[in-house]
Amino acid sequence: MTKGRLGIIGCGQLSQMLGEAANRLGFSVSYLCVDETPVVVGLGPIYYPDQLDEFLAACDAITVERESLPDDMLRKAANVGLAPNYDALVTLRERDTQKAMLDELNIPTSPWSLVTSPDQLEAALDSLPGQYARCKRTLGGYDGGALPNPYASDKPS
């Protein structure tokens, strides 16, 4: 007997690890594959975006592999029981709103600066400590590399 059915939006490696952990805790798991090739084959039923309503109806609670999902999908999932909740996901999916919230709550993060145009880049890099900066998009951009800061001639690393 299971404790209920968890729906995970996503079919990648993080969903695989989450689903395996949920199974060990006694939950059944269903997956909604958004845009990746499923690596969760054999772990539970797999649905696709055109089956969103059917997926949601089959689940007792919903969680996500990543926060950058279409608003309409998140809103529908919120009606079932979405964790983290819709507002948290919207705040967390964009790096600038995420960092601003953490700053407002006095939760330490790495130094950061929002750059919205090439003209702002030099000042932003100059305001950050060290000789390297990690430039990322505010949405997505998980693999932004550490780039040498051309404006930091004498800064310690």
Regions found by a protein language model. Give the residues of each.
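Solvent-exposed alpha-helices and their adjacent loops that cap or buttress functional pockets
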Residues: M1, F55, D126-L128, T138-G141
